[in-house]
Amino acid sequence: MIKKIAFIALLISTTSSFAQHFRTYDWEKNPKLHEINKEEQKESSIAILKKHIVEYVSNVISPEPKLYETEHTIIRVNDDNGIAQHNTVYIPMYEVRKVVNIKARTISPSGKVVLLNQDNIKEVSNVEEYGDFKIFAIEGVELNSEIEVLYTVEKNYEIYGSQTLQANYKVKEAQFLFITGKLESNVKAYRTLETFEEVKINGDNAQLLTIKDIPGMVEEEYATPKANNIAVVYQCFTEGQNITQNMFWTNVSNNVGRQFFPETIVSQATEDVNKIVEGKTDLTNFKKAALVDIFIKSNYTIVKNNNQELSDLNYILTNRSSSDYGILKVYGQYLKALDVEFEIVITANRFLTKFDPEFFVPGMLRDFLIYIPSEKKYIAPDRFEGRIGEAPFNILGNYGLFISSDFEHYFSKIIQEDPDYSRIRRDMNISFNNDFESVKIEQDQDYYGHWSETSRAVLSLSTEQGITEYKDYLTGSGIEDKEILSYEAFNTDMNQLEYNIPFKVKTTISSEELLEDAGDSYIFQIGLVIGTQSELYQETERINPIEMIYPNRYNYEIIVNIPEGYSVEGLESLIIDKSYVARNGEKTAKFESNYKLEKNKIVITIEEYYKTHEFDLNRYEEFREVINAASDFNKAAILFKAVE
């Protein structure tokens, strides 16, 4: 019996440790500073090496393999900002069973090596809601020194995982080593041309991705930098298991379908639906869905916690309180009761994650929408300010998993059905008092699509200060001394039964700073009347693909009344024509302004549009010229000169 126990103990120890790569992987025994070029010396910090190892190890006493992750980084810090960014190390403890080892050291310019004092490693809980961390400060960090960190953790087995290889500083060499031995697995890299190489590690099958000279990710306007990082996703299955991507997606479709497509309508839902449509006839599917959306967002509260009752349909209907997941059950009940066909869409915020239909990772399943196929319109259940219409702008352009009532699924890019959904129409009538002391601007504006949604939400939900700031935007941002003579807004209610009803605003303002005395003449800063404009001026090479918040269009007509006894000069500054022509020959972005003289009036027309939210990175300069054209118009001025 004793021999049997000893044999089992030996078996456990050998099967869980045999050929494990992390046990032999180590840093250089005699470290030296690495060579970096003059340009790299100008950076606050540079990653000499950023290596991540994911190692799945078969375990004969359990069907689940063991999972080890090793992180090895060498960072050169060139200034105080670099030191501040890297001299404290955080090791996430999410799903960590145990810490195998943690090592760190600094190598000074003189070659002095300072090792981490293990007593300095502390454990902190729930750091900014990111979970628990091991944390330690790096000692002995000098300018132009290197910080090297190497640690391994054993984690709870999980089929899926992901790892970001890019950082907000340059990485000279990034490596991702995926060791799975005889286990079935899949791995995929995003946003790089480099591919995985099949290698052997201690006789085990492995795949290695090496990428050199990764530029630091930067925040850029019209971009989704977090979602654009070079990254890896992977899957590794238990012994003898091999699940296809379609099997993963089918499983999700079945589980979600059973939750949100009801077989029967409960009595409380029937009672609610009768109230929703009471006195209303000849309702289209759009109006039915709109009434449901309005009722739910006017009567239910979404609560952010893990209370299981908030996902129970009867509890939700009785208490009018739900989780963002549970509220989908209410939509399902009401829409089915009204015979409105719908589909559930699972997708992700494109500013955070790019949804990939070809590789299943649960981290992509972040956001739910409801799609009404007959109307080609979406409901965003968790967006209190939104109502049925086009897809939310943070989802637009991402792919989604569409699930129908029979639990079948398909993938589709989430597009904007109406190309002119978001647009602004603005008419202005500009006049001057007799002595050119001030200018009066009368404006009539219509805001459609996301513009109208934002306007209604701000005026309905914002603080008094927020409303004041938005009123400033609506009456002419950038005109510092303006006096608001009149202001009236229409269609301000967030609850609209018709598709894309415009938010309207009529205003009258006066300003003195738009005029400048020039002897017997007056300079009128006419460009400022269109409000503050974006400018794209970038000295460094563009990193991110171009993604606008959403497609949009602006159509302005500006009438300037010429005072009697004056002529006008400098009108040529009002003529601008910049465009971006797609590969198929269609203009997909344009800014065009022009004018004509009609007796004592200058009639200025401006047309600016962006028919898509995605533009080619390789043609950034053309896109930039269109964006900057509006800014150029904003600087335009004309001269009123007294007629002799």
Describe the residue ranges of each PLM region.
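Hydrophobic/aromatic-rich core segments of domains that either
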Residues: 279, 290, 325-410
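Solvent-exposed beta-hairpin/edge-strand motifs
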Residues: 29-31, 90-116, 171-190, 458-487, ...
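Long hydrophobic segments that form regular secondary structure
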Residues: 396, 406-516
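Surface-exposed, acidic/Ser/Thr-rich flexible loop segments
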Residues: 85, 92-94, 140-193, 498-579, ...
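A surface-exposed beta-strand-loop module
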Residues: 102-166, 194-229, 282, 429, ...
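Cysteine-centered nucleophilic/redox motifs
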Residues: 73, 147, 176, 292, ...
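Early extracytoplasmic/domain-onset interaction patches
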Residues: 20-91, 416-434, 438-445
